[in-house]
Regions:
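Glycine/small-residue-rich loop that forms an oxyanion/phosphate-binding "nest" at active or ligand-binding sites
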Residues: 71-74, 82-131
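Alpha-helix capping/helix-boundary segments
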Residues: 55-57, 102-103, 132, 182, ...
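A contiguous loop/helix-start segment that scaffolds small-molecule binding in enzyme catalytic cores
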Residues: 9-11, 19, 94, 172-255
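Short beta-strand scaffold positions
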Residues: 51-52, 108, 177
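Class I SAM-dependent methyltransferase SAM-binding "motif I" and its flanking Rossmann-like core
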Residues: 112-170
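Conserved helicase motor
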Residues: 73-79, 153-156
C-alpha cells in the first residue's frame, strides 16, 4: 500500500498584503546568500526598484532570477528623483529602495527620499538585513554597548585626525567606514595619537577573504604597512577605558 502523499503545511502567517508604499530593503554586504527570504519576496513584488547603482543591483537580481524595473537613486539625483517616486507611490505602486550593500540611508543614499515620503504621509516599511556596522562590531571582540557610528571618515587628513582624536576620548566603542586607499594614513594617525589603544580593522566582511585584524593601533598599522589591504574596510576603535572583563590584563572571566 502506497503511503499518502506528503504536503507542506500551510504557513503560520499569511503573506504580507501588498499595498502602495516605499520599502527600504537591506541587501547583502558581500555574500549573496545573506539576503533574507522576505527581502526577496518584496523585491519580486516591486513595481519599481530604486537603487544606488543599477549595474550593481542587477547582479543580485539576476542571481535570484528577479526581473523588475530599475531606476538609479544616488547622492547626485536624489533630490530630483524623490518627487517622481512619491508620485509612483501615490499612484498605487510599491517602490523598493536598495543601496549597493547593507541598509539604505545609513551612509548611503535614501534619507532625503524617506523624509519626503514620510512628510507626504505615505507608507514607509523597512525590511532589515545585513549590516557591516553590526557585523564588524559583533566580531571585533571589543565592548558592543554603547557604540558610536560615524559613517565614512573625512577625506582630508586634518579633519580625519580631529575625528580620530575624538573617538579615542569617547566612553564607547566607535565605528567608521574607511577607504582602502586612506586606511594606512588613518592607522598612522591613530598610532601617533595612541599607539597602545585597542582597535580592529574588519575587511571584506562575509566574503571569501574576510579578515579581522585586532591589536594595538601601532601593531595594526605595522601589519597593514607591510601588506596594504584591499576591499571594503570597517574600523572599530575601543572606548577610552576598557571594562575590566575586556582589559588586556584580564586573565579570568567575571562570574
Amino acid at each position: 500500500m502506497l503511503a499518502p502523499p506528503c504536503f507542506m503545511s500551510e504557513p503560520t502567517e499569511p503573506p504580507p498584503i501588498r499595498v502602495p508604499g516605499l520599502r527600504i530593503v537591506a541587501t547583502p554586504i558581500g555574500n549573496l546568500g545573506d539576503v533574507t527570504m522576505r527581502a526577496l519576496e518584496v523585491l519580486r513584488s516591486a513595481d519599481l526598484i530604486a537603487c544606488e547603482d543599477t549595474r550593481h543591483t542587477i547582479r543580485l537580481l539576476q542571481h535570484y532570477q528577479i526581473h523588475r524595473p530599475l531606476i538609479s537613486l544616488n547622492e547626485h539625483n536624489e533630490a530630483r528623483r524623490s518627487p517622481e517616486i512619491i508620485d509612483r507611490v501615490r499612484a498605487g505602486d510599491s517602490v523598493v529602495l536598495v543601496s549597493d550593500a547593507g541598509m539604505p540611508t545609513v551612509s548611503d543614499p535614501g534619507q532625503r527620499l524617506v523624509h519626503a515620503v514620510v512628510k507626504a504621509g505615505l507608507l514607509v516599511e523597512v525590511i532589515p538585513g545585513p549590516s557591516a556596522v553590526l557585523t564588524a562590531l559583533a566580531g571585533s571582540g571589543l565592548p558592543t554597548m554603547p557604540f558610536y557610528f560615524g559613517g565614512f571618515l573625512a577625506h582630508k587628513k586634518g579633519a580625519r585626525g580631529t575625528e580620530l582624536a575624538a573617538a579615542l576620548q569617547r566612553e564607547c566603542t566607535s565605528i567608521y567606514f574607511e577607504s582602502p586607499y586612506r586606511i594606512i594614513s588613518t592607522l598612522e594617525i591613530l598610532a601617533g595619537l595612541a599607539p597602545e589603544h585597542q582597535i580592529v580593522v574588519a575587511r571584506e566582511l562575509t566574503k571569501r577573504f574576510e579578515e579581522f585584524q585586532r591589536g594595538t593601533s601601532q601593531s595594526v598599522f605595522q601589519h597593514f604597512s607591510a601588506k596594504p589591504p584591499k576591499g571594503e574596510i570597517t574600523l572599530v576603535i575601543a572606548p577610552r577605558e576598557m571594562p575590566k572583563w575586556a582589559s588586556p590584563k584580564a586573565t579570568e572571566p567575571e562570574p
